[in-house]
Design a protein with these regions (language model features):
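Bacterial Sec-dependent N-terminal signal peptides
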Residues: 1-25
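Generic hydrophobic/packing signal
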Residues: 17-19, 29-31, 200-203
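Aromatic-patch recognition
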Residues: 24-184
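C-terminal partner/receptor-binding element of secreted or periplasmic proteins
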Residues: 174-209
């Protein structure tokens, strides 16, 4: 616990001291799309522990303002996205994949050609099927999806955020084939992959930057 707190404090201090990195908060998809958020200061980014993920689920990062409790509350419940220097994070509380919510806190974003991709826990039938443990019980419906997803709290897949609708779509094999259509060599390499996990998908998304 002390070690985790120390690391978090060091991370916060690094953000503050790194040339006063630009920190911008966005309250909705329109502001993010247009790049017209509000500039703030003294934000702190903490990587959430595996224990925290198992207890409450949600995104990998916690963003708060240690010197401003009301701002911290806003960041948690109402803020849509946060940009700190070149790093962008979206609030999982505001994200939706079909009818499923993605929990709280923040997910890191990979920006590729004006598109926004972020990593989060696999939820729903389309996402969980790709990562469900081999021995997981196969159940039907939402209950089955929830049970399967609960065993995947430390797993990540990519979602693509549509800022016009505010909806997210799972980035699976079919979507990656569309994105790689203009890169035949990359597409051939991708077709050999057997996983849709974030580490695999992300490898090819980064090559499109």
């Amino acid at each position: 616990m002390k070690k985790t707190l120390f690391i978090s404090l060091v991370f916060c201090l690094a953000i503050v001291q790194a040339g006063r990195a630009q920190q911008i908060i966005y309250s909705n998809p329109d502001e993010l799309a247009e790049g017209r958020g509000d500039t703030v200061s003294t934000l702190c980014v903490e990587r959430r522990t595996l224990n925290q993920l198992y207890l409450t689920g949600g995104g990998d990062y916690r963003i708060l303002s240690p010197q401003n409790r009301s701002l911290s509350r806003y960041l948690r419940k109402r803020c849509y996205a946060v940009r700190i220097d070149t790093a962008l994070y979206v609030n999982c509380r505001k994200m939706r994949y079909k009818k499923f919510r993605l929990g709280g806190w923040y997910a890191p974003v990979l920006e590729v050609g004006g598109r926004i991709f972020y990593t989060a826990q696999p939820v729903g039938q389309a996402a969980t099927e790709t990562l469900t443990p081999t021995n997981a019980q196969k159940l039907r419906g939402e209950v089955g999806d929830a049970i399967q997803a609960s065993g995947l709290v430390d797993q990540r897949v990519y979602y693509e955020l549509d800022l016009e609708t505010g909806h997210s779509n799972f980035v699976g094999k079919e979507r990656m084939r569309e994105l790689l259509a203009g890169k035949p060599e990359l597409l051939t390499e991708f077709e050999k992959e057997t996983s849709e996990a974030a580490e695999v998908t992300g490898k090819y998304l980064r090559k499109l930057k």
